[in-house]
Structures are given as C-alpha cells and as structure tokens.
C-alpha cells in the first residue's frame, strides 16, 4: 500500500487514517498491537483491541492521527508496519507505554505489558480477518472481491508467462490485463539469440531478432 501518496497528510495531527479488522479469541483478553514507521526516525503507535469476549467476533476500529515526526519516503521500500500480537512476551513491553499516541520507537517499549491468559491456555485460538487501512477518520465495510477480480488487479503489477519459441521473426506477447506502467521484462530461463529490439508497453511486450526460446519470463510494474 502506497502510504506516501495515499492522500493522508501524515505530518498533520488533524489528518487521520483508520485501521479496522475483525478478531476472535477462544479466551477473553485484551490484545496488544502497534504500528511502526521505518523511514527517518522510526516512530511507534501502540494500540489494543480492548477486552474481547471469548469465542465472539468483534470489530476493532482505530482512528490514527498524523504526527510531525512521521516520514514516508516515496519508494517501494518498507515504510509502515502493522502488528497485532496474541502474546508479545516481556522483552518488548513496558508498563509506562502510552497507547493511542505516537512516540519514538524503541525495541523494549513497543506496547504496554501484555496479559498472559491466551499464552498460558492450552489449545487457545486467535483469528483475524477483514483487515482494512483507509485514509480518513471513519471505517467502511470491508470490500469483498471475487478471485478473478483480485487476480486481475494483481496482474496490473506482475505477471509470469511460459513457453514461447521462435525462429528469426519476433514476438508480441499480450499481457493478461493492462499493466500499471510499462514493465521490466526478465527472462528467467531459456535463451535469446541475436536480439534487435525489446520494447514494452502497458499492454504487450515486443521482441524482434534472431532465433530464441523462452521457458519463463517475469513482467514487473511494481511501484
């Protein structure tokens, strides 16, 4: 998810993102989590689910403000990490940690002290679904998509094709869907002879030249 260009004015305390998810535990407990930013001076935002009723699906919604210390570089590296722990142990917690507020990240002060009920209960279960992160101060219903819809959206960024061969002509290889941008093409296995030209667009990949065979090729248009 592109945080830097999402529309969230993340350095302003009056601009928000909203995290929502459904969670169920076989034991009643308050579970801890945190958000961590990576770029610049790392920041942490601890939160909790509140005490869950055993074996009951509960929707958790967290509205998170921006902060002047946040930084998200405009690249494809990791910049935003989201955690929710059934049990985080004792090495990363501290009784003095304040929830629902940004502060400088430190390994030993990620969340307040976590209850041990779930951890010490044999065969305890923990389930989570419908995780959604949105710009704004309100959550919306989770958007369910069919497998075909989700696959087509993913293929805008990456696809893989196999088994093409030729003599001394050329290929025009059509992608399954129009890609986000002209991708980079990488031949993973096979051989290419005297190549005259390789061109890519958002809709196809064109190779012209001498004899060639391709067992597998990756096309990537990642952010």
Task: Give residue spans per PLM region.
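Extracellular and organelle-lumenal recognition/adhesion modules and their flexible linkers in secreted
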Residues: 1-223
């Amino acid at each position: 998810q592109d945080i830097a260009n999402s529309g969230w004015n993340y350095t302003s305390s009056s601009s928000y993102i909203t995290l929502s998810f459904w969670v169920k535990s076989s034991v009643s407990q308050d579970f801890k989590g945190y958000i961590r930013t990576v770029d610049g001076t790392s920041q942490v935002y601890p939160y909790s689910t509140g005490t869950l009723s055993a074996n009951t699906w509960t929707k958790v919604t967290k509205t998170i403000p921006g902060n002047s210390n946040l930084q998200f570089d405009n690249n494809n590296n990791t910049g935003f990490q989201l955690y929710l722990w059934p049990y985080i142990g004792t090495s990363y917690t501290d009784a003095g940690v304040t929830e629902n507020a940004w502060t400088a990240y430190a390994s030993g002060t990620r969340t307040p002290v976590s209850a041990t009920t779930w951890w010490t209960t044999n065969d305890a279960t923990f389930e989570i679904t419908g995780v959604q992160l949105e710009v704004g101060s309100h959550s919306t219903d989770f958007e369910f998509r069919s497998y075909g819809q989700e696959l087509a959206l993913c293929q805008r960024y990456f696809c893989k094709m196999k088994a093409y061969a030729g003599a001394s002509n050329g290929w025009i290889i059509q992608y399954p869907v129009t890609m986000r941008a002209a991708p980079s093409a990488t031949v993973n296995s096979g051989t290419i002879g005297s190549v005259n030209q390789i061109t890519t667009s958002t809709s196809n990949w064109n190779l012209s030249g001498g004899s060639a065979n391709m067992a597998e090729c990756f096309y990537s248009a990642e952010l």
